[in-house]
């Protein structure tokens, strides 16, 4: 949906066949995700998935998400049926949703799908905790992928974040990533800076105390840095 499947897939293929691939990684070692831009009909969704697989050139897509709950109940359920069939046909390995609120998830579960959603990708961080959605997901074994886990750098100098970063000898970004991990989420930190990408992943050397996790939880102010369709009809 971001019009970069071809380029992203080529980058993966080029790397796997290059001398930079010093660990001899194979296609199955790479986790490639794409999305359906909008829900409409079964046929439209099914064709879009096939097109995405062809565009990326990787043979299959590891995780395919319905980008939002927009489109209404019928479109949501028909689009999910297309995901199920694409999994059966081997075009994708795992299906999930994105920006789904509790009512959308419950709607999908109530429809008795053949395949349950494995992932719900939502904006989640200490300033927008969305515990209502996260708790529902975890109760139903749906992995929470946290996008914008760094709050798009809007809160790096917040007194609590700055103080705890100093306490744990880490960067604000590392602290925020660690918060997501300790809640059981899969954070998706974003950067175009190679050093910062590496830095954001170096979070295994410390753990945030429970009392400090609670301090960070209390920062919630429903800060939406992009959009929030989780309550759409």
Indicate residue ranges for each PLM-predicted region:
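A short, structured active-site edge motif that brings together acidic residues
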Residues: 24-40, 62-69, 121-124
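Short acidic capping loops at alpha-helix termini that bridge into adjacent secondary structure
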Residues: 22-30, 59-63, 93-94, 116-119, ...
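Short, acidic/polar
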Residues: 41-56, 105, 128-129
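N-terminal binding-site loop/beta-alpha segment at the start of enzyme catalytic domains
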Residues: 1-29, 82, 151, 232
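CE4/NodB-like, metal-dependent polysaccharide N-deacetylase domain
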Residues: 46-66, 85-89, 111
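Conserved hydrophobic residues forming the short capping helix/wall of the S-adenosyl-L-methionine
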Residues: 12-19, 53, 87, 112, ...
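Beta/alpha (TIM)-barrel catalytic core signal, keyed to glycine-rich beta->alpha loops juxtaposed to Asp/Glu
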Residues: 68-233
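Aromatic/hydrophobic pocket-lining residues that form the small-molecule binding cavity
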Residues: 8, 45, 49, 76-79, ...
